[in-house]
């Protein structure tokens, strides 16, 4: 997996943001599973949560050959967040924060880093299909809804999402 030129290490307080390393894939998958189980249980049934996990797991491995770029958030040597996006189109694929680190600014910092990287490349917008449990988080970060809840197929299971976007300022 190549590390892009924009993989500058960002470290403030005790949080470090950087591009993912291949040896972290198992830890990232574990973080994604925990975040889905904790954060999505009010909006999605177990089958839907498993389908979402499988979709993100496949996407993480596809990053090695596909267009997506991944960022991890590390605090005190522990992986506490993960984000994945397409640096060409601005499609946001994922932002996951470990349960104990939720509500501590990790997700906001990951989004800010994605926006920084997109702006460096001339990106004008960040968009994606957001899970129902995360709509308020994205709205607070300046995203607007493009649709009401709609269902997407995720690993063969129908999962409701809301399409959202944020226009980036230069």
Residues of each region from the PLM?
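Extreme N-terminal starter segment of soluble prokaryotic enzymes
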Residues: 15-16
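Conserved catalytic-core motifs of GNAT/GCN5-like acyltransferases
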Residues: 127-129, 144-163
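Conserved GNAT acetyl-CoA-binding A-motif
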Residues: 118-131
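Conserved short alpha-helix immediately C-terminal to the canonical SAM/SAH-binding motif I
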Residues: 110, 134-137
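Acetyl-CoA-dependent GNAT
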Residues: 3, 10, 19-23, 30-100, ...
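Conserved active-site tyrosine of GNAT-family acetyltransferases
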Residues: 138, 143
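Glycine-rich phosphate-binding loop
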Residues: 105
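Terminal substrate-recognition subdomain of acyl/acetyltransferases
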Residues: 2-10, 156-170
